[in-house]
Amino acid sequence: MRIFKIVVLTKRSLILLITIFIFLLFISISLFIKINLLPANTFADPRSGIIVIDPGHGGVDGGTNKDGILEKEINLDVGRKLRLFLEQKGYKVIMTRDEDISLEALDNSAKSRHQRDLNARVNIINNSNAQLFVSIHVNCNLKKPSTDGAIVFYNNKYEQNKSLAYSIQKALNNIVVNNRKRTVHNPVQAKYFVLGNADIPGVIVETAFISNKSEREELVKGTFRENTATAIVSGIEQYLHESTNVSSPGQ
């Protein structure tokens, strides 16, 4: 014969158990949010279509250069073309700079001019309520001038960074120079300041190697810059389609 014990909870015990349950539930939810979710301003409306373009360098900072060709000028022109193509598709674009200037005057929190410039770019990105950002740069490898191709850099701070990097890299790898494809690269994980301090997904795109003679000749051509901007747009839209399943604003 089985004997069943009946446990009778007092009102005080019941309240205590409910309190403990609610506390544990709260802790679990808090940990889930902390581990899996991005900062609040990352969750911009996926249909808002805001994208930040960050043309690197500018003003007193010319960036890398070769044979009188300045990186800062290429970055700005590619950035403007990228803005045009994105706006034609219905996106709203915010530029960190739209002229030949550096941005250190917008920040006074550091002694170094270079650091103030970087801080200003991060502040613009983080206050944009954008879905993502793309920083435009030009690469250089004087020790191995034969190196060519576009390379996309990302930080592993957010999982979305890697997805965005791979989408843009895939599109850039298809650009043809002088009737041949350039070296196919994979995205590279990096700890650049802008990537590590941005509160939204983003990448740095090194469009080509100014140290490579063939690519240097292409970098000054409007067609190459347009093809680069077009490829970046394609990568952005592929990323947005895969991550949010939302059509571009113009569709």
Which ranges hold each PLM region?
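Catalytic-site microenvironment of enzymes
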Residues: 1-251
